[in-house]
UniProtKB/Swiss-Prot annotation:
DNA-binding region location: 45-114
Name recorded for this polypeptide: HMG1/2-like protein
Source species: Vicia faba (Broad bean)
UniProt main location, coarse: nucleus
Composition bias, Basic and acidic residues: 1-15, 35-44
Gene Ontology cellular component list: chromatin; nucleus
SMART domains in the cross-refs: HMG
GO biological process: chromatin organization
Keywords in alphabetical order: DNA-binding, Nucleus
């Protein structure tokens, strides 16, 4: 057999293909969803911005006024980062204070959100238990009906 492959060669080729397929899926960004991970709640309050992000919001507005033709997000981010690094601690202080205030507000809203969740969980848990009890009663009645036949 001039052009044919031996059994050993074909098995090697198959295992190489299998390895490549596994590797290709991982490299193409085909992430598997995490098992047991709950989906994010859209009603949950967002985390507060850090001092840098508070600064960046102000800087972005000023940068757009000074450079109206610049549409590059990367350029704005780079300029902002360089400006932030050049600031002294005294110059950063107002942004740190604003970030702390936002963090305190976040903690208050998060506590309120968690209280709402606890209330919903208690109500849902009692509803579920009632329905489960009702389902069990119905099942027992069905079994009794079958015994009568």
């Amino acid at each position: 057999m001039k052009g044919g492959k031996s059994k050993g060669e074909s098995k090697k080729a198959e295992t190489k293909l299998a390895v490549n397929k596994k590797g290709a899926a991982a490299t193409k960004g085909g992430k598997k969803p995490a098992k047991g991970k709950e989906p994010k709640d859209p009603n949950k309050p967002k985390r507060p911005p850090s001092a840098f992000f508070v600064f960046m919001a102000d800087f972005r507005e000023q940068y757009k006024k000074d450079h109206p033709n610049n549409k590059s997000v990367a350029a704005v981010g780079k300029a902002c980062g360089e400006e932030w690094k050049s600031l002294s601690e005294e110059e950063k202080a107002p942004y740190v204070d604003r970030a702390l205030k936002k963090k305190e507000e976040y903690e208050i809203t998060l506590q309120a959100y968690n209280k709402k969740l606890e209330g919903k969980d208690d109500e849902e848990g009692s509803d579920k238990s009632k329905s489960e009890v009702n389902d069990e009663d119905e099942d027992e009645e069905d079994e009794e009906d079958e015994d009568d036949d």
